[in-house]
Each structure stands twice: as structure tokens, then as C-alpha cells.
């Protein structure tokens, strides 16, 4: 077979896809958006009832906090490994398929855990962690593929359309779970039905693969053949020396956001409380989560707009939002708990979007990749610590949980204020 790098591209072929079947960039962007929509239905649908599911299998609050916190940490920290791996190997599609397959398989498999007797809880914990590892495996490679498609239509518009479809799945998944759980009167059928959007995500991804060139191939093919071999560009590697050269203001900001992450109780622990204390019917738990995801989307848009106009000061709201959550979400009043969950969603929206914008402002362009890797590692460590702490304190004393998170957020607020002051003085 002729190697792509040994031939020059022509009008009929780009990379490894003939022009006659190749999709336009916009169709590829929308295609990736549909994949994310379907996959988010699977993951977010499961996330909306992780707490009640683990509780039904005999988990304590501290175990729920540990597993949900560790899952979020894995999804963040392991990207430091799989991002460079995708660039070094060029296997963007392989890693993307592998990550989505883990989600499509592990989440519906949770439906069998209630029938595994004493092993059910352990198997459920492993499946939850494996699904989150899948997120880390696919995210860097998928984002590179999306950027390859979106480059022709504008990265801003392309990523915005993709994010809108992604958020639609984050709302639709919990709504589907709520409907099935209400009809069935139990949780496992709601997990089982998620095999449908999971399979759809893989089928659409396979379809896109047939219609879109592989970046690793098309970039090699589009490069003119030189008479002498060009020196191979160095592969990205994780270097602690680069990390240690990041400015002090970045480390202050990472510490502030780490404290905010540690205090942001996972929805697993919140939903555990909502069902254990019968604050709301179990079928309402995913509905409340869907509303929180809508709040997250609105908060991300609003905080992003305010950030562009007023700078990082908008992020001072994050520790305040986080501190308010446990005081409301862990009450036995349904209206107060729902308000607490909506505030939790707003905090998630700010944390997952606008926080990352300030990172880019605090470090030189040449060290942004390193900075985002370090930032993800700090947030991951904080997620494990915070999830475990919240679960342990919930089992012992709710007032202690509320007071501890308030103290952590006061620390985050001070660190954030110092960060903004130093950034202003630079």
C-alpha cells in the first residue's frame, strides 16, 4: 500500500478520505457535537443518580464522596498522559474511539450491579472509575480532531456549536433517566436504557471517521516532499522543569481554584442526601440535576461575558457560590435543597469555563500547555480530597461540613484576591 506521506495530495483526495465522500468542515463540527450530545446523555444521565445507586448497593457517604471525587480527578489528571500520547502516536481516532467505548460500555453495565449481591458495590465503583478514565483517554484526541475540523470555519464558532450540542446532551440524559426511573420504580432500567445513546455515539463517530481526514495523515500529505529528510519536531513531553518555571501568580491562582474545587461537593454526595433523607422522590433527583446543568450553561455564558468586559474579578463570585451550596443543598427542605443544587450548577459552570480563561492570561503563550496540565493535576488532587472530606463530614456532622467548606472558601477568596492584585501589578 502506498504510504500517504509518499504522495502529494490532489484535488480528489485529502489525507485518507476521497473528496467525493468527504464532509464539509461544518458537517464534521456538527457531527462531533452530536457524538458529544449522545455521550453526555450517557455520562450525565448516570452522574445524576450515582449517589442513589451507590447508596442502594450499601455505600456510605464517605465512599460516595471518594469514588465521585476520584472519578473527576482521573478525568482531569490522566489528560496529562493521554494528550502527549495522542500527539506522539498520531492515533487520534484510536484514542477517541477507546474513550467513548469505555463510556458506552461501563455506564449501561451499572444496570447489572444490583443483581451481583455482595460484589455489586465493588463492581459499580470500578465501572464509575473506568468511565471517567475513558473521559481522560478521549478528550485530548477528540479536541484535536474537532479543532482540525473547526479551523476552516473559525475555532470560536466551531467550539461554540459543539459546546451547545454537548450541553443539550447534559440536560437530555438526566431527563431520560428520570422518565425511565419514574416508570420502572427502580434505578437499574434507567442505567440499561443508556446503552441506546451510547451505541448512537459510537455509530456516529464511525460515520465521521469515514467522512473526515485523519489529521496525522492529511498534514503529512499536504506537506511538500523535501529532497532531504526534515528534522522531526520534538514531541511534547511533560517536563517538571517547565512547570517550575511558571510564574508565582499562576501557582497562587491554582491554589485558589484547588481550594474552590475541594469545597465544591460532588453531586454524588448531594444526591445521596436527597434520597437517604427522602427530601425529594428518587425520580426527581435526575430532574434536579438537569436543571443544574442548565444553570451551569447560563453561568458559563454570563461569567464569560463578564470576564471579557471586567477581567478576572468576576471569579471572586466562585468561592461565594461554593460556600453557599452545602448550607442549602443539605437541608431537609426540598425548595432550599433545589436552590442549593442550582447554585452548585452555577459554580460548576464558572469553574469549567471562565476559570480556564484566566489561566491563559497568567502564563506566557509558550507554557500554556504545561500550565493547563499542572492546573488539571491540582484540580484533580483537590477533587479527591474534597470528595472524601465531604463524605466523611456528612456522616459525622452537617454543621461541621458547612463550617469547614466555608473556611476553605474564605481561603480561596483570599488567594484569589491576592492573585488578581498581583496580576494587576504585573
What are these regions (language model features)?
Residues 3-26, 210-256:
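Juxtamembrane intracellular "pre-TM" segments in multi-pass secondary transporters
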Residues 18-73, 249-288:
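Helix-loop boundary and gating motifs at the non-cytosolic
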Residues 78-91, 181, 298-311, 394:
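Helix-to-loop junctions at the C-terminal end of transmembrane segments
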Residues 88-101, 308-320:
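Cytoplasmic membrane-interface "Motif A"-like loop-to-helix N-cap segments
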Residues 101-118, 321-332:
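C-terminal ends and interior cores of transmembrane alpha-helices
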Residues 127-168, 358:
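Cytoplasmic helix-loop-helix junction between adjacent transmembrane helices
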Residues 188-207, 401-418:
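Symmetry-related core transmembrane helices of the 12-TM Major Facilitator Superfamily/SLC fold
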Residues 310-355:
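C-terminal transmembrane helical hairpin of 12-TM major facilitator-type secondary transporters
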Amino acid at each position: 500500500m502506498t504510504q500517504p506521506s509518499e504522495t502529494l495530495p490532489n484535488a480528489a483526495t485529502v489525507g485518507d478520505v476521497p473528496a467525493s465522500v468527504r464532509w464539509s468542515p461544518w458537517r464534521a463540527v456538527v457531527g462531533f457535537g452530536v457524538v458529544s450530545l449522545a455521550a453526555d446523555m450517557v455520562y450525565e444521565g448516570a452522574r445524576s443518580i450515582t449517589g442513589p445507586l451507590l447508596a442502594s448497593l450499601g455505600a456510605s457517604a464517605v465512599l460516595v464522596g471518594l469514588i465521585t471525587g476520584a472519578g473527576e480527578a482521573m478525568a482531569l489528571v490522566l489528560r496529562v498522559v493521554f494528550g502527549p500520547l495522542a500527539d506522539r502516536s498520531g492515533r487520534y481516532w484510536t484514542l477517541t474511539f477507546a474513550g467513548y467505548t469505555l463510556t458506552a460500555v461501563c455506564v449501561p453495565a451499572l444496570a447489572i450491579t444490583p443483581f451481583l449481591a455482595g460484589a455489586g458495590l465493588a463492581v459499580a465503583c470500578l465501572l464509575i472509575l473506568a468511565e471517567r478514565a475513558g473521559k481522560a483517554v478521549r478528550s485530548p484526541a477528540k479536541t484535536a480532531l474537532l479543532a482540525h475540523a473547526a479551523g476552516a470555519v473559525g475555532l470560536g464558532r466551531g467550539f461554540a456549536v459543539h459546546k451547545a450540542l454537548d450541553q443539550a446532551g447534559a440536560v437530555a440524559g438526566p431527563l431520560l433517566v428520570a422518565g425511565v426511573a419514574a416508570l420502572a420504580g427502580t434505578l437499574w432500567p434507567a442505567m440499561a436504557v443508556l446503552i441506546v445513546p451510547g451505541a448512537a455515539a459510537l455509530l456516529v463517530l464511525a460515520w465521521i471517521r469515514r467522512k473526515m481526514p485523519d489529521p496525522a495523515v492529511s498534514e503529512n500529505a499536504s506537506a511538500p516532499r523535501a529532497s532531504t529528510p526534515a528534522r522531526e519536531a520534538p514531541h511534547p513531553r511533560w517536563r517538571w522543569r517547565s512547570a517550575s518555571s511558571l510564574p508565582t501568580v499562576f501557582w497562587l491562582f491554582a491554589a485558589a481554584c484547588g481550594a474552590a474545587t475541594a469545597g465544591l461537593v460532588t453531586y454524588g454526595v448531594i444526591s445521596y442526601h436527597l434520597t437517604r433523607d427522602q427530601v425529594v422522590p428518587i425520580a426527581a433527583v435526575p430532574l434536579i440535576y438537569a436543571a443544574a446543568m442548565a444553570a451551569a450553561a447560563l453561568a458559563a455564558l454570563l461569567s464569560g461575558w463578564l470576564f471579557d468586559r471586567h477581567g478576572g474579578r468576576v471569579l471572586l463570585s466562585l468561592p461565594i457560590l461554593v460556600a453557599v451550596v452545602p448550607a442549602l443543598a443539605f437541608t431537609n427542605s426540598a425548595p432550599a435543597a433545589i436552590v442549593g443544587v442550582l447554585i452548585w450548577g452555577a459554580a460548576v459552570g464558572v469553574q469549567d469555563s471562565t476559570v480556564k480563561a484566566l489561566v491563559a492570561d497568567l502564563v506566557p503563550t509558550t507554557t500554556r500547555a504545561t500550565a493547563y496540565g499542572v492546573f488539571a493535576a491540582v484540580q484533580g488532587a483537590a477533587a479527591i480530597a474534597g470528595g472524601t472530606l465531604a463524605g466523611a463530614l456528612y456522616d459525622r456532622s452537617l454543621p461541621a461540613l458547612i463550617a469547614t467548606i466555608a473556611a476553605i472558601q474564605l481561603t480561596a477568596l483570599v488567594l484569589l484576591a491576592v492573585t488578581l492584585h498581583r496580576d494587576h501589578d504585573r
